[in-house]
Design a protein with these regions (language model features):
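N-terminal catalytic or cofactor-binding beta/alpha core of small enzyme domains
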Residues: 2-93
Length: 93
């Protein structure tokens, strides 16, 4: 039964070391934090790749490849100058 991909930032340094010796495969979700209108959270562009990565790991299951996947903390930043007018945007400038 699949219980979710391991999250790098939820592991201890010892657990990370063990996974690295077993050939861990890092998954880096990338998205931006910016406005999407009043009906969606500002992290929508991050939540989608995080969910997709978790679904891919679920599809692979507990076989060797699926068990080696570890999700890194998402990269939340982008150049989003067009969204600077709205509160909540995290912009690299």
């Amino acid at each position: 039964m699949y219980t979710g991909m391991a999250r790098w930032d939820h592991l201890t340094w010892q657990e990370i070391g063990e996974r690295l010796t077993r050939g861990a495969i890092a998954v880096l979700p990338v998205g931006s934090v910016e406005q999407h209108g009043p009906h969606l959270p500002v992290a929508t562009d991050v939540l989608i790749p995080v969910g997709l990565a978790d679904r891919v790991a679920g599809a692979l299951g507990a076989d060797d490849l699926g068990a080696r996947l570890v999700m890194l903390p998402p990269f939340y930043y982008t150049y989003a100058k067009h969204s600077n007018w709205w509160p909540g945007t995290l912009n690299l400038d």
